[in-house]
Curated annotation (Swiss-Prot):
UniProt lineage: Eukaryota, Viridiplantae, Streptophyta, Embryophyta, Tracheophyta
Cytoplasmic side: 1-85, 141-174, 230-247, 393-706
Record's protein name: Probable cyclic nucleotide-gated ion channel 3
Protein transport listed as a keyword: no
Subcellular location: Cell membrane
UniProt GO MF annotations: calmodulin binding; cAMP binding; cGMP binding; monoatomic ion channel activity
One term under GO cellular component: plasma membrane
Entry keywords, A to Z: Calmodulin-binding, cAMP, cAMP-binding, Cell membrane, cGMP, cGMP-binding, Ion channel, Ion transport, Ligand-gated ion channel, Membrane, Nucleotide-binding, Transmembrane, Transmembrane helix, Transport
Entries under SMART domains matching the protein: cNMP
Residues exposed to the Extracellular side: 107-119, 196-208, 269-371
Pfam families, alphabetized: Ion_trans
Length: 706
């Protein structure tokens, strides 16, 4: 408080130059600071106009992040269905980790006392914590998974409720308590926190606590699997994609039950051993229970425990005073309770559980101990139920792999009975059997048309495009079409199969379909209405088509189906696409692109009818050309003969003799050519002009596209 007063006093003192100089500098700096502060305040005021927008944008970003974090998921989403499947498998696997805690106690063979395996308890705690982490994630998903309200599920999927409060209340009232009891880390707390701080023997406390803790948590874990299984089957329809995976899952469940019973058998064996020790220790003076649990101050117990708890086979016990270990004598005699080798005691106990579970506990010879009898009863009932489920599910899953083969066998049997009942000839029976076999090889018993008809229109269209588009473009006629026209054709094509020597269409029958060949070889023949001396054949391969309906489809006045002028027969197995006349008519009326001259010229080029007509037309023209050439040659020879005869009239006798010889040679040569040509003309091309096939119809439209 002294300095400010002094500064004020000095400010009014103008005589002291030295001091005044010292005081003026701070005043200038203070003025500069005030100016600087004013500029900063002004700039801050200018910035305040933009500050609310930035704050608002930051709030929007934070809200978007919260929305992303708190986003409600649809229970029918694919990723949530995948997570449910993964968590279901993890829940089943988690049931195999909890029994590992039962293997922690073991009998120390050096002192005949009960001890704990520190290494195994650490491993068991790590596995259990890892599985519990997935349970926590699943619980978080449950708080953010919507549900379908029952009132809106009358039609369709129903309305999804996305209110966080309703979702939380629904989950808290259903499976939250079961999930919470399942993830409580009670075994870890018992092993790592409670047991080391107990004043009582650690091995005794651990044995008693682990038995009840694991059993109490095993119940909610098993109870949670069934509703989760129902949820997976409701959303995705099935848990496993293949039959072998389903069979393996059921076999794993059976082996899991064997593992659980084997671990219980191991722990109860140690408990029976401990009870025998306690009874023996109670009969001896100065014997404390601390000696039985490897106390640091304990003594060697082998001197009196060997004689007090002998390991005698239950069938050989004749004295009631001898402790009867019953079904647990095998574990004590084999030495697995005294071993710290985990694989050794795990596989031995697992084999014991699998053997007795499969035998339904028939080989178990129990003592009079009530807990042992109840344990044997549970093994018997569980083995009966699990074995029945295993056989039933395995049979169901494995039969699903051969269901198509069985259906084919039933169809063949029905076909054989029908053919026998109708007394069909052998050739027809062979053709039917061959067709069924070929159809099975191509489709494997799947009815494609029925499968596609059950799908939505857009999905069916995309599938047809994927299956047919590449094959259609192999046909040259389709290569000039645009995508819209090809899509329309793909949506209406049907796959067909023909066996060897089967007829696709016969001459004189109405043409109802167009066949586009994808695989196989065919032959197309015609006799032009059965006229004598006319026969034409053409080989059809992949990329060709038969059944010329385009001209009929382009004619708006056409009503009846055209008559086929050719017979088409399959030389090998044929696979192709069939386009019905009605579908082609619909495409032709809806898509004017089909009326273009380019497509019609290409159609003529690849049409068998047009090719046949063109070949016959060329043959007729060539024959006319040959006749004209022959007649021209005859006229030239006649002219030469005429000139020779005229020269003979003006010449002498020698020339008359040469002319006569030349005339005779010309006459014989001409007659021979005429006879040969007439015979060939009558045998090979009788009345060529009259037998020329009729030109295929080519309707012209007033509005053609170029």
């Amino acid at each position: 408080m002294m300095n400010p007063q002094r500064n004020k006093f000095v400010r009014f003192n103008g005589n002291d130059d030295e001091f005044s100089t010292k005081t003026t500098r701070p005043s200038v700096s203070s003025v500069m600071k005030t100016v600087r502060r004013s500029f900063e305040k002004g700039s801050e005021k200018i910035r305040t106009f933009k500050r609310p927008l930035s704050v608002h944008s930051n709030k929007n970003k934070e809200n978007n992040k919260k929305k992303k974090i708190l986003r409600v998921m649809n229970p029918n989403d694919s990723y949530l269905q995948s997570w449910n499947k993964i968590f279901l498998l993890l829940s089943v696997v988690a049931l195999a980790f909890d029994p590992l805690f039962f293997y922690i106690p073991y009998v120390k063979p050096e002192r005949f006392c009960l001890n704990l395996d520190k290494k195994l308890q650490t491993i068991a705690c790590v596995f259990r914590t890892f599985i519990d982490a997935f349970y926590v994630v699943h619980m978080l998903f449950q708080f953010h998974t919507g549900f379908i309200t029952p009132s809106s599920s009358g039609f369709g999927r129903g309305e999804l409720n996305e209110k966080h409060k309703d979702i939380a209340l629904r989950y808290l009232g259903s499976y939250f308590l079961i999930d919470l009891l399942s993830i409580l880390p009670i075994p870890q707390v018992v092993v790592l926190a409670i047991v080391p701080r107990m004043r009582r023997p650690a091995s005794l406390v651990a044995k008693e606590l682990l038995k009840w803790v694991i059993f109490c948590q095993y119940v909610p874990r098993i109870a949670r699997i069934y509703p989760l299984f129902k949820e997976v089957t409701r959303t995705s329809g099935l848990v496993t994609e293949t039959a072998w995976a389903g069979a393996a899952l059921n076999l794993f469940l059976y082996m899991l039950a064997s593992h659980v019973f084997g671990s219980f058998w191991y722990l109860i064996s140690i408990e029976r051993k401990d009870r025998c020790w306690r009874e023996a220790c109670a009969k001896i003076q100065n014997c404390t229970h601390a000696y039985l649990y490897c106390s640091p101050t304990g003594e060697d117990n082998r001197l009196f425990l060997n004689g007090s708890c002998p390991l005698i086979d239950p069938e050989e016990i004749t004295n009631s005073t001898v402790f009867n270990f019953g079904i647990f004598a095998d574990a004590l005699q084999s030495g697995v309770v005294e071993s710290r080798d985990f694989p050794k005691k795990f596989f031995y106990c697992f084999w014991w559980g699998l053997r007795n579970l499969s035998a339904l506990g028939q080989n178990l010879k129990t003592s009079a101990f009530e807990g042992e009898i109840i344990f044997a009863i549970v093994i018997c009932i569980s083995g009966l139920v699990l074995f029945a489920l295993l056989i039933g599910n395995m049979q169901k899953y494995l039969q699903s792999t051969t269901v198509r083969v069985e259906e084919m066998r039933v169809k063949r049997r029905d076909a054989e009975q029908w053919m026998s009942h109708r007394m069909l000839p052998d050739d027809l029976r062979k053709r039917i059997r061959k067709y069924e076999q070929y159809k099975w090889q191509e489709t494997k018993g799947v009815e494609e048309e029925a499968l596609l008809s059950s799908l939505p229109k857009d999905l069916r269209k995309d599938i047809k495009r994927h299956l047919c588009l590449k094959l259609l473009k192999k046909v040259p006629w389709f290569q000039a079409m645009d995508d819209r026209l090809l899509d329309a054709l793909c949506a209406r094509l049907k796959t067909v199969l023909y066996t060897e020597k089967s007829y696709i269409v016969r001459e004189g029958e109405p043409v109802e379909d167009m066949l586009f060949i994808m695989r196989g070889n065919l032959i197309s023949t015609t006799t032009y209405g059965g006229r004598t001396g006319f026969f034409n054949s053409v080989d059809l391969v992949a990329g060709d088509f038969c059944g010329d309906l385009l001209t009929w489809a382009l004619d708006p006045l056409s009503s009846q189906f055209p008559i086929s002028s050719r017979t088409v027969q399959a030389l090998t197995e044929v696979e192709g696409f069939l386009l019905s006349a009605d579908d082609l008519k619909f495409v032709a009326t809806q898509y004017r692109r089909l009326h273009s001259k380019q497509l019609r010229h290409m159609f003529r080029f690849y049409s068998v009818q047009w090719q046949t007509w063109a070949a016959c037309f060329i043959q007729a023209a060539w024959k006319r050309h040959c006749r004209r050439k022959l007649s021209k040659a005859l006229r030239e020879e006649e002219g030469k003969l005429h000139n020779t005869l005229q020269n003979d009239d003006s010449g002498g006798n020698k020339l008359n003799l040469g002319a006569a010889i030349y005339a005779s040679r010309f006459a014989s040569h001409a007659l021979r050519n005429l006879r040969a040509n007439a015979a060939a003309r009558n045998s090979r091309f009788p009345h060529m002009l009259t037998l020329l096939p009729q030109k295929p119809a080519d309707p012209e439209f007033p509005m053609d596209e170029t």
